[in-house]
Amino acid sequence: MFKQSVFIKSAANKSGWIEDNIPEVCFVGRSNVGKSSFINTLANNKKLAKVANTPGKTRLLNFFDINNSSFRLVDAPGYGYAKISNSMKVEFGIMMEDYLTTRENLKLVCMLVDLRHKPTNDDVQMYDFLKANDIPVLMIGTKLDKLKRNEIAKNEKLIKETLEFDQNDVFVKVSNLDKINIKESYDALIRLLEVENG
């Protein structure tokens, strides 16, 4: 769990990015995957990443200082929400591609997928994009508590097959509600970021 976490700023484009050498981990996932809840659980702060009432509402990159500048967490807008305009989807695509391909601070992407469902085309495209650009990925399967015991392995297999998951990447199944594997996901994040733990 994060020892310290504080919101710094939001940015719509490169001009708003923070200029320093602090490593960043970017959290991505489709709308309603449980990204804000996962961030809040890691931070042990229910209000850190505001859980938007309307999926796809936040169209900015939100920057958070973690563990007294040990690293930064960058919360990206949820993707795949049908009710936003095509122009907003294009803006989102440009913003994300710019950040993911040119941001030197970016050391890791934490991609969240819903364990209950087969990955969407948006999920597949995001994972393919990350792999094509050699961006390290930590995959988090959310909503573990919503699955029956006999569904867990089957659903994980379906997700990995659909994404053509790289076995060198780490996959952690979590429940924000029951706090299952939160420490394991944090430990994996710290290990992959190669930063000091606190």
Swiss-Prot record:
Residue ranges crossing the lipid bilayer per the database entry: none
Disulfide bridge partners, by residue number: none
Cofactor(s) required for function per UniProt: Mg(2+)
A single Gene Ontology CC term: cytosol
CDD domains per UniProt: YihA_EngB
Domain EngB-type G: 21-195
InterPro entries xref list: G_ENGB_dom, GTP-bd, GTP-bd_ribosome_bio_YsxC, P-loop_NTPase, Small_GTP-bd
Mitochondrion as UniProt keyword: no
GO biological process, one term: division septum assembly
Residues the entry annotates as binding GTP: 29-36, 56-60, 75-78, 142-145, 174-176
Xref: PROSITE patterns: G_ENGB
Example GO molecular function: GTP binding
Residues involved in Mg(2+) binding: S36, T58
Keywords in alphabetical order: Cell cycle, Cell division, GTP-binding, Magnesium, Metal-binding, Nucleotide-binding, Septation
Keyword Cell cycle (UniProt): yes
Domain of life: Bacteria
Family the entry assigns: Belongs to the TRAFAC class TrmE-Era-EngA-EngB-Septin-like GTPase superfamily. EngB GTPase family.
Entry-linked PANTHER family: ENGB-TYPE G DOMAIN-CONTAINING PROTEIN (PTHR11649:SF13), MSS1/TRME-RELATED GTP-BINDING PROTEIN (PTHR11649)
Functional description taken from the UniProt entry: Necessary for normal cell division and for the maintenance of normal septation.
Protein name per UniProt: Probable GTP-binding protein EngB
Species the sequence originates in: Mesoplasma florum (strain ATCC 33453 / NBRC 100688 / NCTC 11704 / L1)
Protein's gene: engB
